[in-house]
Regions:
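N-terminal cationic and glycine-rich segments that engage phosphates or anionic surfaces
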Residues: 1-103, 108-437
Length: 437
């Protein structure tokens, strides 16, 4: 990995791209500390220090914003609206024929879907910004903080609208920065910003665990977190690289006087075909009842049950629900993102076949069978990766705000591997260009 970056810095074109990407990252991190008008930041700092290590319902969104959410800054929403919009459009592509047709139109269709994603991102940013401001005004953003109600001292409508506009504009700027990295830098822009956002929360989260620890001044908890985190990174790297290669052969065809085909290749089916999406889906779904209960009035029985069972990450009901939702969404997302019938039809169209399997419907059935078999261990792996941090700290009685959580590790390792692959492919391409000259 370090060798690839060193070689990239020795190549002028890649060095410019890497420096441009680093410059955008600096701009993004500066934006996460720019305050918005109408917020009492002394009260915010007091509540953040009191809530350190226990971010509650907003922990996931705060992680994706690089800690900017609980600071209520311009980039408070981070890239979460874009992630949500991308997932929604990906799901709608399967349901709405018009979007499915656009997806098959190539570059023009992809550009149109990207435009829809931008519009939906802005709409979601307005909704999420309004919800965040309303939560901060009511004092529910930092429940239990003594000065939570004074975070937004001015309750005027104009102040609320100004705050929402600032956060929505910040989301649009983040989206633009991500697209700049994609076009002129290295790697996928949104993935890089996601990587940076998560990595930025690691030092404070680790230090919070050390401060809250009780064994040897917190150093035992601190060391155990580092050890478990390294083991998880190694496991994630191993599984993310694992794939089942389905062999494919292409028959020879004579077109004019030339012979085409006759080659052998394979279809790479990853063990974790769904990626990190099931974990995000499951986390978001579990936040909904807890969020409703937090804003609901009165002391009804259902509200008390949700508060006790679905807001604490170490509660058995929460753990079981989280695990089952991850397994379900892993199968669900694989089913909508990989179409065996479409793959089988494309293979048949170009004269490809799987040895021992007839072309057409039998090929589609075989691919579905293989995919279901490898999705089972993939879904169980996702569930375990998401729950291991919580289970590791239950014995120590430390905070469940584990910095090496399943979502963060999956994203960091996935983005890191993909970025290194892209750098190596560009280095290889430039080597070939030098050879051809």
């Amino acid at each position: 990995m370090l060798t690839a970056f060193a070689r990239a810095f020795r190549t002028p074109d890649l060095r410019k791209k890497l420096l441009f990407t680093l410059g955008i990252i600096v701009v993004y991190r500066v934006g996460t500390h720019i305050p918005i008008p109408g917020v009492n930041y002394k009260a915010v700092q007091t509540c953040v220090s009191e809530a350190s290590g226990n971010q509650g319902l907003f922990g996931l969104v705060n992680m994706f914003s690089g800690g900017a959410l609980l600071q209520i800054t311009v980039f408070a929403l981070g890239i979460m609206p874009y992630i949500t919009a991308s997932i929604i459009l990906q799901l709608l592509t399967v349901v709405i024929p018009r979007l499915e047709a656009l997806k098959k139109e190539g570059q023009a269709g992809t550009a149109k879907i990207t435009q829809y994603t931008r519009y939906l991102t802005v709409a979601l940013a307005i909704l999420q910004g309004t919800g965040l401001v309303a939560t901060a005004r009511s004092g529910a953003l930092f429940s239990g903080c003594t000065v939570a109600s004074s975070i937004v001292p001015d309750q005027a409508i104009f102040t609320t609208i100004t705050m929402v506009i600032c956060m929505t504009a910040g989301t649009a700027v983040v989206m633009w920065l991500g697209e700049l990295i994609t076009d002129r830098g290295i790697g996928n822009g949104m993935s890089i910003l996601m990587f940076i956002s998560i990595a930025a929360t690691f030092p404070s989260a680790l230090w919070a665990i050390k401060k809250q620890g009780t064994l040897a001044g917190g150093w035992i908890e601190f060391g155990s977190v580092i050890a478990v985190g390294l083991v998880m990174v190694a496991l994630v790297v191993f599984v993310e690289q694992a794939q089942r290669r389905v062999p494919v052969q292409y028959a020879k065809r004579m077109i004019g006087r030339r012979s085409y085909g006759g080659t052998s290749t394979y279809i790479p089916l990853k063990v974790n075909q769904a990626g990190v999406i099931p974990v995000i889906f499951a986390s978001s779904l579990l936040y909904i009842p807890a969020l409703v209960a937090q804003f609901a009035g009165g002391n009804s029985g259902w509200k008390e049950w949700i508060t006790q069972n679905l807001t604490k990450g170490d509660h058995p009901i929460y753990i079981v629900s989280y695990f089952l939702l991850i397994v379900f969404f892993a199968f669900f997302y694989v089913a909508i993102s990989f179409n065996p019938e479409e793959v089988a039809d494309n293979m048949k169209k170009y004269g490809g076949f799987i040895p021992g399997i007839r072309a057409g419907r039998p090929t589609a059935e075989y691919l579905s069978y293989v995919l279901n078999r490898i999705t089972w261990p993939g879904s169980l792996y996702l569930g375990l990766i998401a729950l291991v941090p919580t289970m590791a700290l239950v014995g120590f009685g430390a905070s469940n705000n584990f910095p090496f959580g399943g979502t963060s590790i999956l994203i960091i390792v996935g983005v890191g591997l993909e970025t290194v692959k892209q750098i190596e492919s560009q280095l290889q391409q430039r080597n070939y260009e030098g050879f051809l000259r």
